[in-house]
Amino acid sequence: MNAKGLDLSRYNGRGNWQKVKAAGISYVILKAGGVYSGAGDCYTDELLENHAAGARSVDLPFGLYWYFLPFTPVQTQADYFLALVDKYKPQLPIVVDVESSNGKNAKVTTSVLKALITRLQSPQKPVMIYTRQSYWDTNILSDPIWASCELWASRWSSGLTSPWSDGYFKFRDWTNWRFWQFSGDNNALAISYGFPGYPNGDPDIDLNWYNGTEADLYSWIGAAQPVLTLEERVARLEAAVFGH
């Protein structure tokens, strides 16, 4: 079975991390920060510290993502994000969330994104791109650098076995995916996965599949898979039987 994960930001509120793990979650991807759409200033997500501490408290590997907008100088975005990466030391590859051009054309957006990826990438820090096909193929120009990045695809559907298993929404620049965000809006599942829901957080929560099992995930990141306690195994079995 594919490993299930969450992606989280301040909108989700503060979680009950024992419940998160008991719900069958194998990893989380946390919003590190991003760029404001007005002046282009960088910011840190206000619950990053809380979410990172929570993931560590139950031995869940986590990643960090950066909300990209095509502002320059790129060095400012790169340095800000890398400082957070160095502070929190995520086990999963770092992610650039690409879903808005903030009014810029494809040439400008592509140029700034390519420059950011170039500054972020290193053998020790591979970069993954989060995006949806309908945005990417329209607003980002093709370039060989994208092939060096893993894909975290977004397409919300409960009836698919992969982001494009129905033959639609295939990406121009990727033929495979590493993560797939398959659910988000209007699922009302935040409470089921250990988060407060309305009014203390978003009632919905973003759900993701890893393209492989939990054992595959740990092998990919080069970490030992933790041994679940009897209570954790029972809780996961109940979550699987009664469904999320």
Language-model segments: what does each one mean?
Residues F68-P73, K104, Q133-D137, A224-T229:
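Noncatalytic linker/hinge segments flanking ATPase motor cores
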Residues A224-H244:
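Amphipathic alpha-helical oligomerization/assembly segments
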Residues L92-Y168:
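Catalytic domains of cell-wall/extracellular-matrix polysaccharide-remodeling enzymes
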Residues M1-R10, Q18-K19, P144-T229:
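Functionally critical loop-and-helix segments that line ligand-binding/catalytic clefts
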Residues Y36-S37, F71, W136, L160, ...:
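Flexible, glycine-rich phosphate/dinucleotide-binding loops
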Residues Q77-F81, A106-I117, D137-P144, F171-A190:
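Short secondary-structure transition/capping segments
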Residues G24, A32, R56-D59, V85, ...:
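Sec/Tat-exported extracytoplasmic proteins
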Residues M1-K125:
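Substrate-binding cleft of extracellular glycoside hydrolase catalytic domains
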